A protein has these predicted regions:
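Short helix-loop hinge/linker segments at domain boundaries
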Residues: 53-56, 63, 74-97
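A short LG(V/I)-centered, amphipathic sequence patch enriched
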Residues: 41-60, 250
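Residues within the DNA-recognition helix of helix-turn-helix
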Residues: 29-32, 36-39, 110
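Central regulatory/effector-binding core of bacterial HTH transcription factors
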Residues: 91-154
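C-terminal regulatory
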Residues: 133-138, 148-264, 291-296
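Alpha-helical residues within the helix-turn-helix
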Residues: 24, 42, 63, 116
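A bilobed periplasmic-binding-protein/Venus flytrap-type ligand-binding module shared by bacterial periplasmic
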Residues: 264-274
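Short helix-boundary/capping micro-motifs
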Residues: 12-27
Length: 296
């Protein structure tokens, strides 16, 4: 068995979630792809892939082996370039994910500058307000807000954001400024369903308040627009309200009761052995995000 080719086939199957798609992309027959993966599993002595009704997923052992294969194949590619007298330059397609609003406001400008710096590169952005599986969905770099589970991935903290409650000055002038979380029950509350997991808002020192939202919006942008219109109070992340706060269109209340900030991390699977395209983007993202006063 050609071990390196078997690794390439396995990686492609894991990334595409399909034996048939792998066969087409690698100009092989589907039975050949199946035989190669089966032979690799026999050689290793562990099941790497499991078929579901719609796709192919990696097992726990397969996920770990996938990371190792990517690192090893990346090392081989860079060694071949070095032996040929070439420097490893970013190449191929980079896939980046982030929360929707954060992606549009702060990641997309990074991607555009990255593509300008490396004209041969292509990029795909995946900005969604749901958990994204980095391995299953073929993500190269993820920008994550919040505390991370132990995934074995490399994570570089680049800043933090606050959970803030804010309203338009006109609303606060009309209805008053709440002095404690308990006073929220006397106010009109607007929430975003994308961030709405519980009617319970938590505050520092374990304080909790049940809120009854008068309006639930399907996007953070809509919730912020409603608050800007002077209609009610909303709770969002500080970067989401940043432009409105800077303009004076919104004002933060109850900041003395805020929970600790949420960390922002740049996350990627391969660590120090990441391919050049990933390292170049990570270096750019870390420098720019750490230099942004909104996150520090």
């Amino acid at each position: 068995m050609d071990r390196w080719q078997a690794m390439r086939v396995f990686v492609k199957v894991a990334e595409t979630g399909s034996f048939a798609s792998t066969a087409r992309q690698m100009h092989m027959s589907a039975p050949a792809v199946t035989r190669i993966v089966a032979g690799l599993e026999d050689l290793i002595g562990a099941r790497l892939l499991v078929r579901t009704t719609r796709s192919v997923k990696t097992t726990d052992a397969g996920s770990r082996y996938l990371q190792d294969c990517r690192r090893i194949l990346g090392d081989i590619a860079e060694a071949e370039l070095a032996a040929a007298g070439h420097y490893a330059e970013p190449s191929g397609t980079l896939t980046i994910t982030a929360a929707s609003m954060f992606g549009h406001l702060h990641v997309l400008p990074l991607v555009l500058d990255y593509l300008d710096a490396y004209p041969g590169m292509h990029a795909r952005t995946f900005f969604v307000d749901r958990p994204v599986n980095i391995v299953d969905e073929g993500i190269d770099v993820a920008i994550r807000i919040g505390h991370l589970a132990d995934s074995g991935f490399t994570a570089i903290q680049v800043g933090a954001v606050r959970r803030v409650i804010c309203a338009a000055p006109s609303y606060l002038e009309k209805y008053g400024v709440p002095a404690t979380p308990a006073e929220l029950k006397h106010h009109r509350i607007v929430v975003s369903q994308s961030a709405w997991a519980s009617p319970e808002w938590r505050f520092a020192e374990g304080q909790r308040v049940l809120v009854d939202p008068v309006l639930q919006s399907n996007t953070n942008e809509s919730a912020i627009a409603t608050a800007r219109a002077g209609w009610g109070l909303t709770r969002v992340l500080s970067y989401q309200a940043g432009p409105s706060l800077q303009e004076g269109a919104l004002q933060i209340v109850l900041d003395a009761f805020e929970e600790p900030p949420l960390p922002i991390h740049v996350v990627y699977p391969e660590g120090r052995q990441a391919p050049a395209k990933v390292r170049a983007f990570v270096d750019l993202a870390v420098a720019r995000l750490r230099g942004n006063p909104l996150f520090n």
